[in-house]
Amino acid sequence: MKERLTIIDFVEKYVAKYSKSPFLWEKNLDTNVWEPTTYEETLIKAKRIAAGLMALGVQKGEKISYLSEGRDMWVIGELGVLYAGAVNVPLSIKLGETNDLVFRVKHSDSKYIITSKFQLPKVRAILPECPLVEKVILFDEVPDMKENEMHISEIIRMGDEFLASNEALFIQRYKSIGPDDYANISYTSGTTADPKGILLTHRNYTANVEQAHSVIGVDENDKMLIILPLDHCFAHVAGFYTMMSYGASIGTVPSGKSGKEALRNISPSIQEFKPNVMLSVPTLAKNFKKSIETSISKKGPVIEKLYNFALKNAIAYNKEGYNKGTQFVDIFRKPLMLLFDKLIFKAVRQGLGGQMKFFVGGGALLDIDLQRYYYAIGIPMYQGYGLSEATPIISANSPHRHIFGSSGKVVQPMEIKILDADGVEQPFGSKGEICVKGENVMAGYWKNPKSTADTVVDGWLHTGDMGYMRDAEMLYVVGRFKSLLIAADGEKYSPEGIEENLVENSKYIDGAILHNSQDPYTIALITPNKEALKAYAKSLGLDPSTKEAKVKMLELLQEEVNMYRKGGRLYGEFPERWLPAAVCVLPEPWTEQNHFLNSSMKVVRGRVEEAYKANMEFAYTPEGKNIVNDMNLASL
C-alpha cells in the first residue's frame, strides 16, 4: 500500500532530492531579472516563517486567512503556515464585497490574516467585524503600519530566535502533523445561506499529485508560469506540488495595484520567462488566441491568408487529436505541416515565449474549437476536469492519450461511476452524474454537516456535474447534473441559497433554478404561482387573461427577483454578479408526473434545462433579457 504522505513529508522528500535546483522564480522589478529560489532555500525560509508563527502563538489546527496576489512568498508563506501545523484559508483577491470577506474570515475562525499592501485596505475595512483576528501579517512594507499589523520580516526574525532555543519543539510540531489533518479550507462557492468551506487534508493534496502523475508529466528542467490565482487548489496540485515532484520550477506573474494591471503583466512575463507549461482557463485561452490573430492581421493580407490556409490544413490533419494523420490524404499533407510549422507556427509560438510545450486547461469546459486551434499551432491545450472537492483533478488529456471534446483520462488510483437521477449506475456512453471515490475526496464542508452528507455518500463524491464514460478510461463532461454556476471566467458558485430565497420570499414564485454555463450572465428559470398572479391582476381591476394583465404579472415577477439587487429590501444577501439578469417563466410546475422531480422530490435540473432549451437560448438575446417577451407571456 502506498505511503500516506503529509505535505510536510512530500516537501521534505523532494527538497532532499532536488535541493540545489531552482523551484521558484520571481521578477526583480528593480533589475528586470527573473531570480531563482532553490528547493533548499524555499524550505529554509518556510521553516523560519513557521517558527515565527509558533513564536507569535499560533497553535496547531488554528486558521490563518491568506489574501494576496501571486508571488514567491505566497508559496513560501503557505508552507510556513503548514509547517506550523496551522490551516491555510486562501481567499480570492477578486473578493471586493466586504460582506464576502467578513463571512469567510469569521466562518473559518481565522485568528490571523496574511496579506499584501494592495489588499490591506480590504482587510482593515473588515477587522471591526472580525473580533477573533489578533494579527495582520504583511508581505510588503507600508508607511502607516497599525498596532495589530506586522511585516513578514518580523515573523522571520522571531522565527530565528525561536529556532535558536526551541528547535526540538519546532520539529516536534511539524512531525506531529498527520495525513488526515486539515491543510486548507477553500471557499470557492460558499454563500452565507449555505457555506461551502471545502476541507482539504494533507493527504488529499499528496494523493492527488500521485494521481496526476498517471495522466501527465513534465521534465526536470521545465518551467511553469502560473497565471491563475494561487488561492485555488488547481494551482497547488497542478502547479506547486506536481512541479515539485518532478524537480521542475514555477514562476508567478508580477502583481499590480489592480486585476487589470496584473493582466497586463502576463504577456511580458511570458516573453521574459519563456515557460514550458502553463495552466489556463477558457477566458485566458481566448485572449491569447485573439492577441495572436490581431498580431497576424497587422502583418498584412498575404500573411493573414497564408496563416488561415495553414491553420485550416493543420486542423484537418489533426482530426480529433488521437487520430491525426490517419487518412490517405494526410500522406500529402504531412510535408505541408512541416513547412507550415517552420514558416508560420514557429513564429506564432514565439508570441508565447517560444518554449511552450502545452497548456493544462481547467476551470470551465474548454471550447473544442479552441482545443483544435492550439493543437494546430503546436501548443496543445489539454483539457482537464475537476473540482475543489476532489482537490481538484479528476481527469485530464495528455500527450499520450487525448481526444478533442473529452475531459481526458480518469486519474489513477481513483474509482468513478456515472449515476442517473435515481442513483442507478450507467453503462459506457450513457449520461448521468459523475461520482468519484479516492483519497483525493475532501474531508467535508467546514461547519456544514448537512451539505457534507448530501455531497459525500459512503465515500463517493457526488460532483453535481453531468457526463459519461466513453470507455474504461475517457471521461466526457457535458454540463451540470446539479446546480453549479460557472461564469465565463471560470469562477464557480453554488446557487441553492438564491434559489431557495426566491421561492421562500415570494408568494408568486413556486420554483426557481439558476443557470450559467460560461455565459455572459446568469438566468433564472421559474415556475410561477399562477393563482397568486391572477389574484394580483384582479386586484388591479384587470382580466387575468388579457395581455395587459400578463404584462403586469411579469413586471411583478421581475420586482420579486430585483429585491436582492441594489435598492431592494434584501440587497446584500448574495453577490450581485450571480443574481439572474434574465428570467424564463415556465408554463407548467415541476412534478413527478412530468419527470421534472425525482422520487426524492428534488428537481432534475438536466431535464428542466433540456425541455426549455429554446427559452434559455432566447434569454441570452436582447429581446429575451427583457422579462416582458412573447415566450414569457405565452407561459402565463
Predicted regions and their residues:
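Conserved AMP-binding/adenylate-forming core of the ANL superfamily
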Residues: 24-71, 79, 96-102, 151-156, ...
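ANL superfamily adenylate-forming
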Residues: 28-31, 121-179, 292-345
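Structural core segment of the AMP-binding/adenylate-forming
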Residues: 56, 83-158, 172, 562
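AMP-binding/adenylate-forming catalytic core of the ANL superfamily
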Residues: 113, 438, 443-444, 454, ...
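Conserved ATP-binding/catalytic segment of the ANL
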Residues: 188, 410, 421-429, 433-487, ...
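Conserved AMP-binding/adenylation subdomain of ANL enzymes
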Residues: 206-223, 230-338, 342-345, 355
